[in-house]
């Protein structure tokens, strides 16, 4: 086992330290998990990528949420706030970092939307920002995570959003994102 792996195994903290923040900044993909309160509800796990996440403080991160075919994360946060974000190393030393906490949906109607928008490259199709206040930060070994080579970002969603334009995107959200697959309120 290399020394970098020894130093990161099994940490539990209330917030991110600078080493974790730097490591998160180098990751090309992260995963977001949420669930409804209902026992029969569907758990959701979504991959995210690109330059879409910022660490705002040792226990607050935010990511861009784009128009898409689903609205599960937003609906679950609105119902119960629970959210987990996971990062894992696909290159270099193995590591997994999970951020557990309460999520908040910041839509264009929210007072913080414009300020958060300034933190990111502007792209068509931004539906909201998802802000997570973490109350538990864990790292684990990641020894079972395979190596993958990063090839590049996909531009399909961005091109689709640009082609649709703002009005058609809002119509799409009203048609496809009004509620989750379990019937929870989504886009308003």
Model-predicted segments: where are they?
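Binding-site signature for planar aromatic cofactors or substrates
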Residues: 1-188
């Amino acid at each position: 086992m290399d020394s970098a792996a020894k130093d990161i195994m099994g940490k539990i903290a209330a917030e991110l330290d600078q080493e974790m923040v730097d490591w998160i900044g180098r990751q090309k993909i992260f995963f977001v998990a949420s669930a409804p309160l209902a026992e029969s509800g569907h758990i959701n796990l979504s991959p995210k990528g690109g330059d879409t996440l910022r660490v705002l403080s040792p226990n607050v991160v935010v990511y861009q949420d784009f128009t898409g075919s689903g609205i599960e994360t937003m609906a679950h946060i609105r119902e119960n706030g629970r959210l987990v974000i996971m990062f894992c190393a696909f290159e270099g030393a193995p590591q997994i970092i999970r951020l557990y906490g309460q999520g908040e949906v910041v839509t264009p109607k929210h007072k913080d939307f414009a300020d958060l928008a300034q933190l990111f490259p502007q792209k068509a199709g931004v539906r909201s920002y998802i802000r997570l206040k973490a109350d538990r930060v864990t790292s684990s070994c990641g020894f079972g995570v395979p190596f993958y080579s990063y090839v590049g970002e996909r531009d399909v969603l961005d091109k689709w959003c640009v082609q649709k334009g703002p009005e058609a995107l809002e119509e799409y959200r009203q048609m496809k994102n009004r509620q989750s697959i379990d019937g929870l309120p989504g886009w308003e």
